[in-house]
């Protein structure tokens, strides 16, 4: 898969501020005004609440923000970010143009696309953050492109994700390095692999990866969805799934509900391969004694789909200043290093470590843990977010079970 095409699709002109964040903050009166206004505000941070590790990390951040800035951070736990989009959309329709229910949101992909296009986001603001100067916009271009949609300062990058497979090396000593090798492997090991049922997002990501590896037309997939070319563009996906499904768990007539269910099935030996969007997921679970130490993580050699997840501020947030301060702290080396540590979360950083001071760089020093990816593959950008719903609907029409 040509990496040059990916970068051409992604790169946006511009560069981050070339000064240290602390010095920038001291010399910028606008930021000083934001800091002063933020003190005493409460930030209602709407974010997925399905992980104890992530929830604990946000509790730690709340303590730091209270101590440093007198800001109260309240984690509003979501099952699906689409809940937030619907709520903010309803508030706008009802004329609630200020004093909104959400101040900060963990978003990306189709949710960002919807909020940006419907005028549901405050901004631009993110590239004005002092901490944004350390973001690796050159080496991680998805920090400025979200599912092929330019960010344009409307959300702040928070963490990285990439489709990653993991397997018990005691059962799978040689792991498939491509979708074609995976198909050959499942033919020889029927019933030992599956993927989460779309529209679960990792299941949908698996579909997009399969399409890209099997001849999906990139020019179309990285542009907004077109009904006129849908059948032709997605034909390689359905052909590949028709070949794959008979060899999956339950012969492809049932699908696991979630990556969590798949992980447990792998731990129980029912599945031998699984997948995740966090390259450190298996390492986290090995450290927690939930997976055996023989589990290894890997990515397809030519590359796998990856993206950045972001922080957005709804247009009608009541605490916009404090929300910016929270985002700035979550982008700091201290917060990013703790987030990257598998003992706390294991979410890869968006920062360029070579931009950091020696002391801040040292915060990220850690030995490679069992289960971590040892040979990272190139990151492929997400297809345009408008392709998600049509692909999911067609998958359900063809393969969905009630």
Predicted regions and their residues:
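N-terminal secretory signal peptides and thylakoid transit peptides that target proteins
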Residues: 2-17
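Periplasmic-binding protein-like
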Residues: 147, 161, 240-247, 255, ...
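A ligand-binding cleft/hinge motif common to bilobed small-molecule-binding domains
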Residues: 112-114, 273-292
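Short, polar/charged alpha-helical segment
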Residues: 31-39, 46, 51-72, 165
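Mature extracytoplasmic/periplasmic domains
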Residues: 304, 309-376
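Short beta-strand->loop
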Residues: 122-134, 155, 183, 287, ...
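Conserved C-terminal helix/tail region of periplasmic/extracytoplasmic solute-binding proteins
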Residues: 264, 370-402
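Extracytoplasmic ligand-binding site segments that recognize negatively charged/polar headgroups
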Residues: 48-60, 76-83, 98, 102-260
């Amino acid at each position: 898969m040509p990496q040059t095409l990916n970068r051409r699709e992604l790169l946006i002109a511009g560069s981050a501020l070339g000064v240290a964040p602390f010095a920038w903050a001291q010399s910028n009166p606008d930021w000083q005004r934001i800091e002063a206004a933020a003190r005493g505000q409460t930030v209602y941070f709407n974010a997925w609440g399905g992980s104890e590790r992530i929830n604990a990390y946000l509790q730690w951040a709340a303590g730091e923000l209270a101590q440093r800035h007198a800001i109260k951070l309240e984690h509003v736990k979501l099952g699906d970010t689409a809940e937030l989009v619907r709520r903010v959309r309803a508030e706008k329709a009802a004329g609630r143009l200020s004093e909104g229910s959400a101040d900060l949101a963990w978003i990306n992909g189709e949710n960002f696309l919807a909020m940006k296009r419907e005028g549901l986001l405050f901004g631009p603001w993110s590239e004005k953050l002092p901490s944004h100067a350390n973001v690796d916009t050159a080496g991680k271009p998805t920090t400025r492109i979200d599912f092929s949609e330019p960010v344009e300062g409307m959300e702040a990058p928070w963490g990285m994700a990439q489709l990653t497979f993991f397997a018990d090396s005691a059962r799978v000593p040689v792991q498939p390095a491509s979708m074609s090798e995976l198909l050959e492997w499942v033919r020889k090991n029927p019933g030992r692999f599956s993927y989460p049922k779309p529209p679960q997002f990792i299941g949908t990501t698996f579909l997009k990866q399969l399409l890209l590896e099997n001849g999906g037309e990139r020019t179309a997939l990285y542009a907004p969805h077109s009904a006129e070319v849908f059948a032709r563009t997605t034909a390689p996906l359905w052909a590949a799934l028709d070949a794959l499904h008979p060899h999956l768990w339950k012969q492809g007539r049932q699908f696991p509900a979630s990556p969590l269910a798949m992980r447990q099935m792998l731990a129980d030996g029912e599945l031998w391969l699984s997948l995740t969007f966090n390259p450190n997921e298996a390492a986290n679970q090995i450290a927690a004694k939930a997976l055996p130490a023989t589990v290894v993580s890997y990515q397809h050699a030519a590359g796998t789909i990856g993206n950045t997840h972001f922080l957005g501020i709804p247009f009608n947030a009541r605490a916009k200043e404090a929300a910016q301060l929270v985002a700035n702290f979550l982008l700091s080396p201290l917060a990013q290093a703790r987030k990257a540590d598998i003992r706390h979360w294991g979410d890869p950083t968006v920062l360029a470590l070579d931009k950091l001071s020696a002391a801040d760089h040292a915060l990220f020093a850690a030995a490679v843990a069992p289960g971590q990816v040892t040979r990272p593959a190139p990151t492929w950008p997400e297809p345009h977010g408008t392709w998600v719903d049509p692909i999911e609907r067609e998958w359900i029409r063809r393969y969905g079970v009630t």
